[in-house]
């Protein structure tokens, strides 16, 4: 009745008009809808099928088919039956048989009995409708009971990967509205708004979404327990403007800054529509914050309270830079990243670690009261000149809980200031609790000198966590029973077969559910699927070098990677004295990074800005050379200017040479030596700080010598189905057992050699 007072083109009922307990439920609800002054469109839900057949539902809703289209406002609306192939399909029908077959063929998937999918015929129908709308230059909005994307990882159509692939071909698709998942959800993907409307039965008041469609955007007006939101079709820079005290410096959390004019007016440009944080600073005034500003925005106002003795410090850096700033010894943090200033959802102290990072795009401003000291963290431009590029494939903006309100532009800014060239984020939550649009952000924030991808760890379960490089997204990710399928099978299906590369992350970290249980299994059954290992995730890992040397001496080619597991909610940003992986590539492209990791052309820093490169006759890590006599070995290091470093050249697990070098004014040092190599073997290089005994600051992956006599490790068939007793054995192993060479023999007893 309240909606009758609003100007609407039509109303859509997204399904489940009743609980399915009584055949009279739907007719009773239809009597209520009959009082609407607006046309009502109907979508069938799983509860509607409980007491009614498809034919009965078509009659009740006045439909010729449960798939149909209609036009309004020049937009083509396509209504889908997301339960086309499901337990609700007509008994004895071809579609019901397909439902039973699909369950048998996917025993490891969590296929809920109240979800479903489209038949191949229905997907062809959908493609034809989209094709026709595109020819007629019409935008399209799709409607279904069962969603494609929402905040829950399991409440969606079983064939969502196939449907999303179809939608990707048609840029005129603008939105997908659904019900089914009672808590609701909102997500943007490739410029398509996916909105799951909350179920009225779970709300304390009448709830709906009113959708306003414009030429450049879609606005959702929340009604009841639904909230407002907005999605622009095309992303471009927008402005934040308003007033502060004259001469104030206005800084955005993403690094943009401007000084207010004599009248106090300011205006600055940010990357795209979204939610940002602003800070105003002026001599003699306390810092003033606007922590959750939705851009674009006008008429913003700061309340700047007096604070005698506070002063503004303004300066410049040589492009993007990471600074360590103290005020009488206390860190000056970028937006106080251990507290509420950027808009945390909880009080300081929960999860937080103090961050000491301050980032600059080339110009910086902060306020202080005491003695200020500014230190610029090392930046080794010569590494880029040698085509070694710094990156990470296991980082988070925040963890899934979203306790800390990070956003994608802030993360890209921090990564660039910490001199990352490429970055894969394992989580991509926006600071509005809406998952970010991965493709839109990566297109907007990537460039020739910085590659950003928003993805996820997958698989991630009690068998271990797997990072991946080369997949811009994992929309094909499906809910699965991790006790019924191995990470090996999931990685092979969704990552390796797609041409991407996977790396088990922190395989020897002892946290609950964090340990990689399958490393030996991967090496035995598919060693090329495990080209590198994340060995230096945590400095307290038990003896990673001995484990690495053991695998190399068995004949495996194992490169090294290191990751940051960076996340704002724990005060860690990518370079916060955490790990990073360098790759050697001819140019900074995603395809080149994938090939570098596959070919073990990697080196790592584990903190404090150190790096080391190893080359033999000009061939870097990953190279395979013939053991044919004399060669020139070169070791290059990067560390803090003036610092003494210890370099180790390791041959087949034994230290061949150890040298102390003094870093020059740019932090560089190097040496060369002659070697005479006539055997199958490997060399790698380590960098240590004499003041930090026992800690590896950097490592270069091996260079290998191999001739025709070299015998690769035996490869074994992966057992299908995977034996339950073998799965149980792996899951019960301790970190120490997972690093013990004897595990190879225990596994081989269950495997068959590959012919």
Describe every region a protein language model picked out.
Residues 232-392, 397-417, 423-449, 453, ...:
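Long luminal/extracellular ectodomains of secretory-pathway precursor proteins
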